[in-house]
Amino acid sequence: MNEVVFDASAILALLQHERGEERLTVEIRKNAVVSAVNLAEVQSKLVKKGHDPEEAWVDALSTMIEVEPFTSDQARIAGDLIATTEKYGLSLGDRSCLALAIALGAPVYTTEQLWKNLKVGVPIHVIR
């Protein structure tokens, strides 16, 4: 299996044992990558829920997902995506995730229902 990209929401589903986590099988998880931007998003959401920042960072890393740096090419792709995703209200974090997937030619896993309407050139799997 080739690389797959996890959105922050997919990682949070794993960490918090939320509905849909069962769709992220071991086979899928062992090939997962995440943008550094989205890893920061995971940590931020955990801190907002009351976690200590250091513990939140360790928890985010505990998923054993490979972290990819946010490159200038991905930044350009994320900027370009505003034209086709603005009507869906996607954040910079969302577009960063999609930019990584586009750069890698990899499918994306997310919990965001709105994403199933996106046509960005890569498969999008909504896990719940």
Regions found by a protein language model. Give the residues of each.
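Conserved beta-strand segments of alpha/beta enzyme cores
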Residues: 31, 66, 123-125
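Short secondary-structure capping/turn micro-motifs that flank functional sites
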Residues: 62, 94, 116-118
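Short, well-structured N-terminal submotif of metal-dependent ribonuclease cores
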Residues: 1-34, 46-59
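Active-site neighborhoods of divalent-metal-dependent phosphate/nucleic-acid chemistry enzymes
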Residues: 66-109
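Acidic, PIN/NYN-like endoribonuclease modules and their adjacent C-terminal/linker elements
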Residues: 3, 41, 98-128
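A general alpha-helix detector
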Residues: 41-42, 60
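Short, hinge-like loop/turn segments at secondary-structure boundaries
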Residues: 49-53, 85-86, 125-128
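Alpha-helix capping/helix-boundary segments
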Residues: 10-11, 38, 74, 96-97, ...
